[in-house]
């Protein structure tokens, strides 16, 4: 039965997989006829993309926290400084050419990926429910979901976790045709909401004891709130808010103002996350204590999740990206 279940989705997707395989033979991911690089050295890979190219978009280990704090490292690489920031006031004091150059390179993003359209944010509210689910649900589903999330996260680190990445590139079929290793986080973005729904089902079940619900809620809340408070009060001391590609490294006056802006963005997002987690925690507590009913609890949590995701997503996909015909 297990083999049949595994083969069914493979057969359903076989047309697109076979078409992709056929196309790849005529693309840059196919076997190369050129065996040397421009400098005369031997090419690293002849059957697919080379490791440096594959791992160019490797997620930073620390940067992975933007899964729950969207602008932990500044958000996307197109993020701009605030109009009322100290850096913007400094830019206004420059002449036109200098101001344009400084503004152009004043990036709030300080991660080490070359281009990031938007953070891979899954929602602090969903992550809180996911933590609650881990503590509440103890079955086979928890095991395979945690394994899938862990492997996906490690693979998304690419060159920052080279042992596993090199192993996959060298021995896993067609992995050397994978352009951006960070995109494998789609597995995380699928598994966390899925398990959150499983956890909610058990949390709302009458068969689950009140003490189980309260303990799960307490531990999830304490852990996440403690983590958020550590970042809020000590984050600016722990982190340096500098990337490996700082344009203004030789201009400390500009760099210090840019770091100050990054710290502001960081703390404002962390504070926002704290408010959302507290709202979720209070809502669940009121339900467990039978102060509010299940339907109202579900409605409030749904609205919190929608607000949490929408307020971030609208910064990257909004009416400015669309035009009327």
Task: Describe each model-derived feature in a short phrase.
Residues 14-133, 234-273:
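Periplasmic/ER-lumenal interhelical loops and adjacent helix-loop junctions
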Residues 1-7, 137-325:
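Contiguous transmembrane helix-bundle modules in multi-pass membrane proteins
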């Amino acid at each position: 039965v297990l083999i049949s279940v595994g083969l069914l989705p493979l057969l359903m997707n076989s047309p697109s997989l076979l078409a992709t395989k056929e196309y790849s033979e005529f693309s840059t991911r196919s076997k190369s006829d050129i065996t040397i690089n421009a400098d005369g050295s031997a090419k690293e890979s002849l059957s697919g993309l080379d490791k440096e190219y594959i791992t160019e978009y490797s997620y930073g280990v620390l940067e992975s926290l933007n899964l729950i704090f969207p602008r932990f490292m500044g958000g996307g690489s197109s993020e701009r400084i605030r109009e009322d920031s100290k850096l913007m006031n400094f830019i206004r004091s420059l002449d036109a050419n200098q101001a344009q150059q400084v503004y152009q390179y004043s990036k709030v993003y300080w991660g080490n990926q070359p281009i990031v359209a938007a953070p891979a944010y899954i929602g602090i509210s969903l992550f809180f429910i996911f933590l609650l689910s881990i503590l509440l649900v103890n079955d086979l589903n928890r095991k395979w979901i945690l394994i899938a999330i862990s492997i996906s996260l490690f693979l998304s680190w690419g060159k920052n976790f080279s042992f596993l990445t090199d192993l996959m590139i060298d021995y896993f079929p067609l992995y050397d045709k994978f352009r951006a290793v960070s995109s494998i986080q789609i597995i995380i973005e699928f598994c966390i909401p899925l398990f959150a729904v499983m956890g909610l089902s058990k949390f709302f079940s009458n068969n689950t004891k009140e003490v189980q619900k309260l303990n799960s809620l307490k531990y999830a809340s304490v852990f996440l709130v403690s983590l958020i408070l550590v970042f809020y009060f000590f984050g600016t001391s722990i982190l340096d808010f500098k990337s490996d590609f700082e344009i203004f490294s030789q201009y400390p006056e500009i760099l210090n103002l840019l770091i100050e802006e990054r710290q502001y963005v960081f703390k404002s997002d962390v504070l926002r996350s704290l408010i959302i987690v507290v709202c979720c925690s209070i809502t669940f507590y009121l339900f467990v204590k039978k102060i509010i009913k299940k339907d109202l609890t579900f409605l409030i949590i749904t609205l919190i999740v929608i607000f949490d995701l929408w307020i971030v997503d609208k910064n990257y996909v909004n009416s400015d990206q669309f035009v009327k015909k």
